[in-house]
Design a protein with these regions (language model features):
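RNA-contacting regions in translation and RNA-metabolism proteins
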Residues: 1-43, 52-75
Length: 75
C-alpha cells in the first residue's frame, strides 16, 4: 500500500524525489503519512480535495483486499 501511494504522489509532483511516505501500524489500522514539497501540496490535494480523496479511496480498496484498514494523512 505504501508503494501505491508513493507511485501516485511521485507521478503528480514536479519534485518526485521530495516525496516521503511512511507507514505505521496503529492498533487496528495502518496509517500512511505522505510528505511532499510545499509547492507540490496543492497538486497532491487537488481542487476541493478531489485528488486526495481519490488516493484515499484507492488506499481503502487496497487495504480491504489485505483485510485491514488504512488511513492516508498528507502532511
Amino acid at each position: 500500500m505504501k508503494e501505491l501511494i508513493e507511485f501516485i504522489a511521485q507521478s503528480l509532483t514536479s519534485n518526485p524525489e521530495a516525496v516521503k511516505v511512511t507507514e505505521s501500524d496503529e492498533g487496528d489500522q495502518i496509517v500512511i503519512r505522505l510528505e511532499v514539497a510545499p509547492e507540490d501540496k496543492g497538486k497532491v490535494i487537488g481542487r476541493q480535495g478531489r485528488v486526495a480523496q481519490a488516493m484515499r479511496v484507492l488506499l481503502r480498496v487496497a487495504a480491504v483486499k489485505d483485510g485491514t484498514r488504512a488511513v492516508l494523512e498528507i502532511v
